[in-house]
């Protein structure tokens, strides 16, 4: 049961960081590519169907907060934002994630499905506010470390 919760937490942490550690698109036809590190700060599993602790079941939700950091692939840099999200269990092996990232120049919104056992996932950027008002694109999320790790790298690709 705890292994499944750790897997869910790792997937959600990855999603959160990914979707949201982004900067505004640049002028021209080239996408903006940003790499960040997402570190899970906390989370709670909500037993929506009151099944009594048998682990996550269909409809249960995992609510979380992640810190977002500059990252060059080796060393964590300064904190640049926070992601708040919800992952709803849709099957024994998947969840649907939605989240909002708070960055200095605005907010980003993202969503997508995650498989608990996948090491790499993709999620879409739906839009944002402020500097990110017309944001759209895709994020590639890669879990770092073992199954109990709370860290994920991600590459955000915003289309012009």
Spans of model-derived segments:
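Beta-strand-enriched cores of mature, soluble protein domains
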Residues: 28-160
């Amino acid at each position: 049961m705890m292994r499944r919760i750790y897997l869910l937490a790792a997937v959600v942490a990855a999603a959160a960081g990914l979707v949201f550690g982004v900067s505004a698109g640049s002028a021209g036809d080239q996408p903006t590519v940003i790499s960040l590190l997402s570190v899970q700060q906390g989370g709670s599993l909500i037993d929506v169907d009151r099944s009594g602790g048998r682990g996550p079941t269909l409809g249960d939700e995992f609510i979380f907060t992640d810190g977002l950091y500059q990252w060059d692939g080796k060393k964590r840099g300064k904190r640049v934002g926070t992601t708040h999200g919800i992952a709803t269990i849709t099957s024994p092996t998947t969840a649907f994630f939605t989240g909002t990232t708070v960055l200095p120049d605005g907010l980003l919104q993202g969503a997508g499905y995650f498989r608990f056992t996948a090491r790499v996932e993709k999620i879409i950027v739906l839009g944002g506010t402020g500097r990110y008002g017309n944001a759209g694109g895709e994020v590639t999320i890669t879990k770092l470390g073992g199954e109990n790790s709370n860290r994920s790298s991600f590459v955000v690709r915003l289309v012009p």
